[in-house]
Curated annotation (Swiss-Prot):
Residues 1-20 are annotated as: Disordered. This is Large ribosomal subunit protein bL27. PROSITE patterns: RIBOSOMAL_L27. The keyword Cell membrane does not apply. The lineage of its organism: Bacteria, Pseudomonadati, Pseudomonadota, Alphaproteobacteria, Rhodobacterales. It comes from Jannaschia sp. (strain CCS1). NCBIfam families: L27. One of its GO terms (biological process) is translation. The keyword Cell membrane does not apply. The gene is rpmA. It comes from the Bacteria. GO terms for molecular function: structural constituent of ribosome. GO terms for cellular component: cytosolic large ribosomal subunit.
Amino acid sequence: MAHKKAGGSSRNGRDSAGRRLGIKKYGGESVIAGNIIARQRGNKWWPGEGVGEGKDHTIYAVADGHVSFKKGFKGRTFISVLPAAEAAE
């Protein structure tokens, strides 16, 4: 005879790995063309000047310069890359 009653298996205990989303380069940081500035799901941040947006909404630099964050209309935050000479002013 069994000395313990059969225990059911739990349906919990699984979790997916984090997706490593968020800002990768902060305001004022230097970037070169192709650097990823932000990874996101949907548009938490919007692309401004000097940046491109990938099909997964990743924002990346298309020119060398410094990262800039600006608040825009409807409360949107725009990420831009300013050329190095312009960012120094």
